[in-house]
Structure formats: structure tokens, C-alpha cells
Amino acid sequence: MAHKKAGGSSRNGRDSESKRLGVKKFGGEAVIAGNIIVRQRGTQWHPGSNVGLGKDHTIFALTAGNVDYRTKANGRVYVSVMPKAEAAE
């Protein structure tokens, strides 16, 4: 009888969906309030001035301005938003 016996199935072939983490706005880029600057797990980047820290450690802008990254003496990188200077009228 020319029958082919059923082959076993692989138990591999799955992967989790990517989480799209990382820097979304780089140094010098303009942001408005509410823009996400960094998506991260844990605090690889720390919040500086004019930014908020979400419960999932997302850093987001609280004011409009330009993104600034600073490394302090403790080795931590702080993310801030420098407000745009108001135009003199």
C-alpha cells in the first residue's frame, strides 16, 4: 500500500508581537504637549524638566518645545523639553 504516514508537527514557529519601544523624538526635535518622546521598559532614560513619566515608563512632553538629552555625573541620561522662546512683539 503506497500510503505515506503522517509526519509530526513542529512545536516551534511562534514569536511575540514587537512592542515598538525606543526613542520616538530625538535631540533638537520639536514636540508639542502630549507627544511621546521615549517608550521603554524601566527607566533607561530618566525624566527631566517639562516631561512626564507614564505608568509604563513612557516619557512624554508636558509643554511645547525642543527635546534635549543630558547625561549627568551619575551616568543617567535625562530627557527634557526646552520651551520655545516666545516671539517678542
Curated annotation (Swiss-Prot):
The gene is rpmA. NCBIfam families: L27. GO terms for biological process: translation. Belongs to the bacterial ribosomal protein bL27 family. Gene3D superfamilies: 2.40.50.100. Signal peptide: none annotated. GO terms for cellular component: cytosolic large ribosomal subunit. This is Large ribosomal subunit protein bL27. The keyword Secreted does not apply.
